[in-house]
């Protein structure tokens, strides 16, 4: 067999296979031998007829199978020799076939994506330095106090104030409408909590245990739940129990109760360290997004059509799963959102292309920088994760294997290793020192990557 290839510009390769008479004869013989096991010929038990009789009996009826064997065996023999590796077996077309003489078959196969990276080592970035203030630490200590708070039943006759906890029964209906429920119960309702409905708790302040109160409340026009936005509701509330929320003192006992720290200062040092490391990671991730964007903008990518098609389907089905939509085709989804199918396909292909660019950029950097990820690396990362969950490494592995998540975690850890090395390679210039509040504002801003 002889073969010729020609590389195309779209991550495909033209291939031409030319088989001689001896190649064809071998393929037919191999096919006859396979058929011999099951062929039925009068006078012989199944599979026992002589091969020459099987050949006469089957004749050219095995031509299709023989040609398929010819091509598959031929391709298998040259796979390791191909200059441009094949990522999947293509469909061949027979261009010329003269039985007993020669056969010519052609195909177009897809090869690996082609990535030409920009100069990622010359990227310059500006980033703030995380500076944890005493106030930042104090706010975290206050959260610890709230987590360890205990409730204490208030004395009879005492009124509800912000910070108290109440158990209540209530009925509610839209103003002018008849109530559709006999009553609701809400226990451990924290008065004045930042997540409570704005303006609602003011109606409850001053109430006492056992007291009943009727009032109306109007939801804001821009309320997140459209079915109640801008509407007025009538409430009838009865306080069943009223508690004071007792916060522990800020002392060594607080530290010991929270995580076993030997003193308040030790706890504060832990908080400061965790805040600094946590927000430094968040700043790094923000900058990595910008770094990858610049690398991608400065790089060239050629993806096989099958990669884009399959990744588009993957992105689409992930979206369906994430939003808990019923299983459907992209065409049905386009009808549901009242958009042209081509527009929907292009939008998902764009997302797919972005994902592929990120993935292969990371892989290309790993290849150039000779970054590997060993089984020892994986165990070390899993050990850290297990420690953070306060479970054993073996228990964590069991859970990951149970959920079929082992390879996903391996890939994520490897990606993080590549990201860390990339971050070390770029030129960094630290600007202002920002406290945690300022860092949070910074993280919500969009920023150009270049210095």
Swiss-Prot record:
Subcellular location, in the record's words?
Answer: Cytoplasm
Q: Name one GO cellular component term.
A: cytoplasm
User: Which keywords, in A-to-Z order, does the entry hold?
Assistant: Cell cycle, Cell division, Chaperone, Cytoplasm, Isomerase, Rotamase
Q: For this protein, what is the EC number?
A: 5.2.1.8
Q: Does the keyword Transferase apply?
A: no
List, alphabetically, the Gene3D superfamilies matched: 3.10.50.40, Trigger factor ribosome-binding domain (3.30.70.1050), Trigger factor, C-terminal domain (1.10.3120.10)
Reactions performed catalytically: [protein]-peptidylproline (omega=180) = [protein]-peptidylproline (omega=0)
Give the highest taxon in the source lineage: Bacteria
Q: Does the keyword Amino-acid biosynthesis apply?
A: no
The PPIase FKBP-type domain covers 163-248
Q: Name one GO biological process term.
A: chaperone-mediated protein folding
Q: Which GO terms describe its molecular function?
A: peptidyl-prolyl cis-trans isomerase activity; protein folding chaperone; ribosome binding
Could you give the domain comment from the record?
A: Consists of 3 domains; the N-terminus binds the ribosome, the middle domain has PPIase activity, while the C-terminus has intrinsic chaperone activity on its own.
Q: Which family does it belong to?
A: Belongs to the FKBP-type PPIase family. Tig subfamily.
Function as written in the Swiss-Prot or TrEMBL entry:
Involved in protein export. Acts as a chaperone by maintaining the newly synthesized protein in an open conformation. Functions as a peptidyl-prolyl cis-trans isomerase.
Q: Which HAMAP family match?
A: Trigger_factor_Tig
Q: What is this protein called?
A: Trigger factor
- This protein's species is Leptospira interrogans serogroup Icterohaemorrhagiae serovar Lai (strain 56601)
Name of the gene this protein is made from? tig
């Amino acid at each position: 067999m002889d073969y010729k290839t020609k590389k195309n510009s779209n991550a495909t390769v033209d291939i031409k296979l030319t088989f001689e008479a001896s190649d064809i004869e071998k393929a037919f013989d191999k096919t006859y031998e396979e058929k011999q096991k099951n062929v039925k010929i009068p006078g012989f038990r199944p599979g026992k007829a002589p091969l020459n009789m099987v050949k006469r009996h089957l004749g050219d009826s095995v031509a299709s199978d023989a040609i398929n064997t010819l091509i598959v065996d031929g391709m298998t023999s040259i796979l390791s020799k191909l200059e441009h590796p094949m990522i999947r077996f293509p469909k061949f077309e027979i261009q010329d076939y003269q039985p007993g003489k020669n056969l010519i078959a052609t195909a177009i196969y897809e090869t690996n994506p082609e990535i030409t990276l920009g100069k990622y080592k010359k990227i310059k970035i500006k980033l703030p330095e995380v500076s944890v203030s005493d106030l930042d630490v104090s706010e975290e200590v206050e959260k610890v106090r709230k987590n360890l708070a205990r409730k204490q039943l208030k004395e009879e006759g005492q009124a509800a104030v912000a910070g108290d906890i109440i158990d209540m029964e209530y009925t509610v209906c839209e103003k002018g409408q008849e109530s559709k429920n006999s009553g609701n119960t809400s226990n451990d309702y924290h008065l004045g909590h930042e997540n409570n409905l704005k303006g609602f708790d003011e109606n409850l302040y001053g109430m006492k245990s056992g007291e009943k109160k009727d009032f109306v409340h109007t939801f804001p026009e821009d309320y997140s739940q459209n079915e109640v936005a801008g509407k007025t509701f009538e409430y009838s509330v009865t306080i069943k129990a009223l508690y004071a929320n007792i916060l522990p003192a800020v002392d060594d006992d607080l530290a010991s109760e929270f995580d076993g720290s030997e003193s308040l200062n030790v706890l504060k040092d832990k908080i400061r360290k965790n805040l600094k490391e946590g927000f430094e990671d968040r700043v790094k991730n923000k900058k990595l997004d910008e770094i990858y964007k610049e690398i991608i903008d400065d790089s060239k990518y050629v993806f096989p059509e099958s990669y884009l098609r399959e990744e588009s389907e993957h992105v689409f089905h992930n979206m369906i799963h994430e939003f808990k939509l019923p299983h459907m085709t992209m065409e049905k989804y386009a009808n549901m959102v009242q958009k042209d199918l081509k527009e929907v396909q292009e939008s998902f292909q764009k997302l797919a292309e972005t994902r592929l660019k990120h993935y292969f950029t990371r892989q290309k950097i790993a290849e150039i920088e000779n970054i590997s990820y060993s089984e020892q690396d994986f165990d070390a990362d899993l050990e850290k994760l297990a420690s953070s969950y306060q479970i054993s490494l073996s228990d964590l592995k069991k859970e990951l294997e149970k959920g079929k998540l082992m390879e996903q975690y391996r890939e994520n850890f490897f990606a993080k290793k590549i990201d860390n090395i990339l971050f070390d390679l770029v030129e960094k210039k630290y600007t202002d020192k920002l406290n945690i509040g300022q860092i949070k504002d910074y993280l919500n801003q969009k920023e150009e990557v270049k210095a």
